[in-house]
Amino acid sequence: MRFPSPLTEGRLVRRYKRFLADVELADGRVVTAHCANPGTMLGLIAPGRPVLLSASTNPARKLAWSWEMVQADLPGGPQWVGINTLRPNLLVAEAFREGRLPPLSGAATLRPEVRYGRASRVDFLAEGPAGPCHVEVKNCHMMREAGLAEFPDCVAARSARHMDELADVVRGGGRALLIVVVQMRAARFDVAGDIDPGFAAAFRRARAAGVETVAYACRLDPDEVTIDREIPIVTA
């Protein structure tokens, strides 16, 4: 997915109120950017870190800037990490259109935001000759061990509920798929059970029920972010 224009680099001043970040641009201006990430962003929000912002062309928007990436000092070396949790669904839709999602290779359409379960919406409903597949997408941006991407970075009760609802779909005779979009270079994925045992338990229950799970690492630069390759899920 190419950005409409190259991202603008700055340095993080502070992240606050969960969804706001002050960033100093190269010309010395300090702007407030929307931070579309409800997590703790563990290890990513130290003041002074290089960040990349996208600019909105919508004059009615309250905040003209969105925080897209941060350059993090991760185990194994520094790299750009995508923190915008609105991007993964767009990346999955793009990969589907381009035929780069093997688990959904038999689907003809991918409909977003379809109601199901206990007053929930599934991110996508894939439909085709083999029947529907409920698809949930999660963004991953945490790495505490070289090469190992982990989710979540905080207690994620809503995500745990999503896993249980996907399991209910399978128990009812349907098909369900979890796609973890890792917005950085990584070699493998695991759930962070020490941070959220509840999500880890729900993840394991869902897999045991037959929910399919797949993780994809991304390639990122100031011009583009794209799903790059599948990485193994090592959750026991």
UniProtKB/Swiss-Prot annotation:
InterPro entries membership: SfsA (IPR005224), SfsA_C (IPR040452), SfsA_N (IPR041465)
Molecular-function GO terms, alphabetical: DNA binding
PANTHER family registered for this protein in UniProt: SUGAR FERMENTATION STIMULATION PROTEIN A (PTHR30545:SF2)
Protein family according to the UniProt entry: Belongs to the SfsA family.
Name assigned to this protein: Sugar fermentation stimulation protein homolog
Biological source species: Methylobacterium nodulans (strain LMG 21967 / CNCM I-2342 / ORS 2060)
Gene: sfsA
